[in-house]
C-alpha cells in the first residue's frame, strides 16, 4: 500500500488554483486500490508561529514534560508521524508575496526536528526521511520560475532535501492573473505534466 500525504495551503481552499492542480493529480491516482491518500489543509489548521516554549517542549525528555509541554510536543509529533507514514508528499502551494504561505511554513517548522527527521554529523546535517518522494503543485499569478522572484522553488527543494527527500517534482501553473488565454495555456501545460507523472 502506497500512502500519499497531500498538504494544501491555499487561503481559497479547494477553489485555490494550487488545490485544483493537486486534486487533478490525486484524482488520477486515488482509484488505485494500492494507494491511500491522507489530506491536510494547513490553512484551516491555523497553526501558530513556532515559539521557544514549544521548541523547549520537544527538547525536554518525554518523561519529564509537564502537561503543557506534552500538549505542545504532541502538535509536532502528530505532524511528523503523518509525514513518516507517507511514501509521497503532495504539496499544493500558492505564491503569496513571492513566498510560501505562512501556514505552510508553520507546518514545516513542526517537521524539522533534530534527531527525528534530520541529524547533525561532522560533515553537516543528514536527512532521516529516506525512500520518499514529493510532488509540488505551484500556482502563481505571474511568471516567476527561473527568476530571482521565485523563492519558493529553491526553498522547497532545500527543505525537502534537508529532511531526506531528494526525489522532488515540480508542476507549475504561472501567469494565471495575466489574462484568460495565458491562464488556460498554463493549466493545459500543467495537466500535461500531471499526465506524464501518473503514467504507468
From Swiss-Prot:
Its EC number is 1.6.5.-, 1.7.1.17. It catalyses: 2 a quinone + NADH + H(+) = 2 a 1,4-benzosemiquinone + NAD(+); N,N-dimethyl-1,4-phenylenediamine + anthranilate + 2 NAD(+) = 2-(4-dimethylaminophenyl)diazenylbenzoate + 2 NADH + 2 H(+). It is an enzyme of class 1 (oxidoreductase). Keywords: Flavoprotein, FMN, NAD, Oxidoreductase. Its cofactor is FMN. GO terms for molecular function: electron transfer activity; FMN binding; oxidoreductase activity, acting on NAD(P)H as acceptor; oxidoreductase activity, acting on NAD(P)H, quinone or similar compound as acceptor. Homodimer. Quinone reductase that provides resistance to thiol-specific stress caused by electrophilic quinones. Also exhibits azoreductase activity. Catalyzes the reductive cleavage of the azo bond in aromatic azo compounds to the corresponding amines. This is FMN-dependent NADH:quinone oxidoreductase.
Amino acid at each position: 500500500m502506497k500512502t500519499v500525504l497531500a498538504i494544501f495551503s491555499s487561503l481559497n481552499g479547494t477553489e485555490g488554483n494550487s488545490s485544483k492542480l493537486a486534486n487533478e493529480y490525486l484524482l488520477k491516482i486515488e482509484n488505485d486500490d494500492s494507494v491511500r491518500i491522507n489530506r491536510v489543509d494547513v490553512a484551516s489548521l491555523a497553526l501558530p508561529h513556532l515559539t521557544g516554549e514549544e521548541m523547549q517542549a520537544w527538547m525536554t525528555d518525554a518523561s519529564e514534560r509537564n502537561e503543557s509541554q506534552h500538549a505542545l510536543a504532541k502538535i509536532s509529533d502528530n505532524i511528523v508521524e503523518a509525514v513518516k507514514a507517507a511514501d509521497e508528499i503532495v504539496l499544493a502551494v500558492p505564491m503569496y508575496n513571492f513566498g510560501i504561505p505562512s501556514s505552510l511554513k508553520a507546518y514545516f517548522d513542526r517537521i524539522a526536528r533534530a534527531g527525528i527527521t534530520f541529524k547533525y554529523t561532522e560533515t553537516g546535517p543528514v536527512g532521516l526521511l529516506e525512500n520518499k518522494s514529493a510532488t509540488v503543485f505551484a500556482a502563481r499569478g505571474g511568471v516567476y520560475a527561473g527568476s530571482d522572484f521565485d523563492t519558493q522553488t529553491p526553498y522547497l527543494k532545500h527543505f525537502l532535501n534537508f529532511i531526506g527527500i531528494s526525489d522532488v517534482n515540480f508542476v507549475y501553473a504561472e501567469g494565471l492573473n495575466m489574462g484568460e488565454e495565458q491562464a488556460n495555456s498554463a493549466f493545459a501545460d500543467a495537466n500535461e505534466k500531471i499526465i506524464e507523472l501518473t503514467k504507468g
